Amino acid sequence: ACFIGDDTKDIYLTFDEGYEYGQTESILNTLKEKGVSATFFVTEPYAKDNPDLVRRMIDEGHVLGNHSVTHPSAGMPSLSLDKQENEVTENHAYIKENFGDDMYLFRYPTGRFREQSLALLNNCNYKSIFWSFAYLDYDVNNQPDHASSLQKMKDKLHPGAIYLLHAESETNAAVLGDFIDAVRAAGYGFKNF
């Protein structure tokens, strides 16, 4: 697992990519305009369905992370260790073969894991990336209010914060630029893994 335990005033923006609802291009545009690099955790179906967006992520200096093949809704612990390994290695092989990117970060679907899962990732030369901030942004049919979402994000700002945002969220696409500006106004910067 990766814990950023320093006191530098930097934060990490991460986006989970399981489905595309037309918001990722706007997010990439904002990141480019603001000069911020982020980590995008992609599933294999997402990469297959959106190769131009994945290529753009890489070309614009973002880090790709592995988010499994099928994004099991019951979490990785619901699978046998062999199936968990397949979730990691199959997506890794697909991204490596089709995009030339050698991913080394993994985010557990739903955040669920067990000790054996961590050992498996270590054996696959992966680091687990969790988060210190997440909110209910993933339901495209029930998007949170822009102003309150931005305030929640600002309220959780702290050195080493890892923000988990879902790229299918219209709210995240709408407030990202303002959030980046607020982070910088508070004296913080952005890092990537």
Question: Predicted regions span which residues?
Answer:
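Active-site-proximal beta-strand/loop segments in catalytic clefts of secreted hydrolases
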Residues: 15-18, 41-45, 68-69, 107-111, ...
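Catalytic grooves of carbohydrate-active enzymes
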Residues: 157-193
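N-terminal start-of-chain detector that recognizes signal peptides
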Residues: 11, 36-37, 134-137, 163
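Alpha-helical scaffold elements lining the catalytic groove of polysaccharide deacetylases
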Residues: 23-26, 72-101, 112-159, 172-178
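Active-site beta->alpha N-cap acidic-glycine motif
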Residues: 1-76, 81-97, 101-103, 178, ...
